[in-house]
């Protein structure tokens, strides 16, 4: 028995339907499209999601939610990642250089995930409550920049 001699089980591989290649093929003349009608000619293509007249799925399901055009997107930094890096002062520029964030978007937010054991100074637009607590407990400072006034 060779690898080159192995064949798939009988009936597993279906032969390709060669459409419009003569009457002897069984799929010549109208090429399985029937005679006349909207779908018989060239250029026919069904719309995406068309289900033969049945109410399509995207219309059967209810509308839900909306896109908030005022949503702000923040670049997120966790305290655990700051802990692993050398240095005691982290500004937005240093975070960009170190690769902690790729882009500032609408600001930088520091979250409290991770353990902080040393004193650090962090500069960001927003801080979570847990991040503020952990920074202050470690004896560090959190400087909020560009605080919006309403």
Curated annotation (Swiss-Prot):
GO terms for cellular component: cytosolic large ribosomal subunit. Transmembrane segments: none annotated. The keyword Cell membrane does not apply. Coiled coil: none annotated. PROSITE patterns: RIBOSOMAL_L15. GO terms for molecular function: rRNA binding; structural constituent of ribosome. Residues 1-58 are annotated as: Disordered. One of its GO terms (biological process) is translation. Keywords: Ribonucleoprotein, Ribosomal protein, RNA-binding, rRNA-binding. Binds to the 23S rRNA. Part of the 50S ribosomal subunit. Belongs to the universal ribosomal protein uL15 family. PANTHER family: 50S RIBOSOMAL PROTEIN L15 (PTHR12934), LARGE RIBOSOMAL SUBUNIT PROTEIN UL15M (PTHR12934:SF11). This is Large ribosomal subunit protein uL15. It comes from Solibacter usitatus (strain Ellin6076). The gene is rplO.
